[in-house]
Amino acid sequence: MNEITIIKPDDWHLHFRDQDMLLETVAATARCFERAVVMPNLVPPVTTAELALSYKERILAARPAGSTFMPVMTIYLTDKTSVQDIQDAKKAGVLAAKMYPAGATTNSDSGVNSLESLYPVFEALADNGMLLLIHGEVTQKHIDIFDREKEFIDQHMVNIVDRVPNLKVVFEHITTKDAVDFVLAARDGVAATITPQHLLLNRNDMLDGGVRPHNYCLPVLKRSTHQQALREVVKSGSPKFFLGTDSAPHAKHRKESDCGCAGCYSAWSALELYTQVFDELGALDKLEGFASLYGADFYGLPRNTEKVTLVRESWEVPNSITLPNGEPIVPFFAGKQISWKLK
């Protein structure tokens, strides 16, 4: 097969950032995705309906001329989030709330310290038909960074899913066989997003033969056995797993430093890279479900009607992109060949 046409996909997890960065990031995503779930970890974070609506307006203003792209807005849970905050968010059209354990990733310092205190908020999300999106890692310093996803499942995820049985939960950017197995065995209303980097790479690609900061993300890349579990589950076509790039831009100097930031800026190549993975797996027939159907169905949103076509054609991801402020950013897979291209 040298050409594949699918329903236009959506990205169910990404980071746009803010201000002039939006002129770069929104265009990159809008080129091939109709909708995207926008993470709220700005500085300060998007914690209220009012802040979410303001952020949405800034995103819409950054769309390329003629674009029909629509952001799906979220709010950021903190220890101070109230049931009223959830009700206000629902009225404002916000579809989901994102839970970051405090300190788990970029701009998560305002995140949750006392998860137990948030159960009334989780109940309010369920009562209002909103989703809970979870960065599923513990943050205790004594727990090895490669084990933090599994520990979160054992310490928290099982309880959340069991104690609020009518709450829709998305286990974001899963990276381990443990997470795959958990989601497969979980009740209805539990799903997961998977990034291109966790399908394409393992920790050797970040650490073997030199440190590659542009492959550094959180949750961190894991060993190859976990990568293979992710690849196998997307190959299976399970509707519990769908596309979420976690595209996360940082200027080059913030990645290439003595304390580099976590995140892969994949928006310019993500759809093509997912296609390459499904091609490698002999499962191109499963791409449309993963990219275009399962996420919309899980969120209770209509499937897109427009279509996109990808062709088997090699191209090279640029080594650098210039941001609107003049600074360079290194895109994910920079300087490498991709075997599929958006038509």
From Swiss-Prot:
EC code(s) of this entry: 3.5.2.3
Q: What is this protein called?
A: Dihydroorotase
CDD domains given in the database record: DHOase
InterPro entries reported in the protein's UniProt record? Amidohydro-rel (IPR006680), DHOdimr (IPR004721), Dihydroorotase_CS (IPR002195), Metal_Hydrolase (IPR032466)
Spell out the catalytic residues. 246
Task: Supply the gene name.
Answer: pyrC
Cofactor dependence:
Zn(2+)
Picking any one GO biological process from the record gives: 'de novo' pyrimidine nucleobase biosynthetic process
Identify the residues that bind Zn(2+) 1.
13, 15, 98, 246
Q: What is the lineage of its organism?
A: Bacteria, Pseudomonadati, Pseudomonadota, Gammaproteobacteria, Oceanospirillales
Q: How is the cofactor bound?
A: Binds 2 Zn(2+) ions per subunit.
| Residue numbers binding Zn(2+) 2 | 98, 135, 173
Q: Which organism is it from?
A: Marinomonas sp. (strain MWYL1)
